[in-house]
Amino acid sequence: MIPFAVAFGLLLGSAAGASAQHLPDLVTPGTLRVCADPANMPFSNKKGEGFENRIAEIVADELKVSLRYYWLPQGPGFVRNTLGARYCDLIIGYAAGTELTQHTNPYYRSVFTMIVRRDGPLAGIEELADPRLRDKRIGIVEGTPPADHLADLGLVARTTPYSLLVDRRIESPADEMISDLLGGKIDVAILWGPLGGPIVRKHAELQLVPLLREKERPPMAYRITMAMRPNELEWKHTINNVLRRRQADIVKVLLEYGVPLLDEEGGLITSDDGPP
């Protein structure tokens, strides 16, 4: 899900000079304090297994500082009770344009996806308007943009809704949706690409279909930034420089996890040599 879920120009010294680096007064010198969900795979967890954990490590490495997390389940009040309360200084994945925070430059762009069985009746499907969906059962996360597209296509009656805002320590709507797909309770699952892509990599019998052919509104593709407190301009410039210098490393991690990435023309990036 969109952490619905980026961007950082101070030049920092070498590792040998880390203790002498100047960091903005509003963030913690010597430590990158990241706000994160403790059970939100494939994005983050306390074991450091998510792709946002890996990206946080890249940022800390470039800054030559230690990495520390402040853990809180995502949901209403997440920004207020993390960044706002100054327990941490950076959210690794945040949709561009979202209010409440200041954003870095986007560091990747992704898209919502359909997930179907490779050998099933929907194999080769490319868009929601495909007539084969008319009599199929469609799993959809409530309140996400694809739900509006399905409504416009008259497919709401065919949908099985899954919750958007949950405590991922207790339940996982995405895993439930994929289980229902594998078990035959639904015929197609629709998920945010950075969530669906890594799940599909674990199931060879499933196919990920980026929704690249849908109408523009509401958007199906989103730019992801990093988020920080408003008015921390020096910190924003610092992180933007990190993102620029380590873009290739970040893209490599995202592709390794199976996150579908788009270039500026809306085409899929298939190697870490592609543009952000």
Where are these regions (language model features)?
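Extracytoplasmic small-molecule ligand-binding "clamshell" domains
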Residues: 20-99, 168-171, 256-257
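Solvent-exposed, polar/charged alpha-helical surfaces in well-ordered, non-transmembrane soluble domains
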Residues: 53, 57-61, 81, 85, ...
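Alpha-to-beta junction loops
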Residues: 64-66, 84-93, 135-137, 176-177, ...
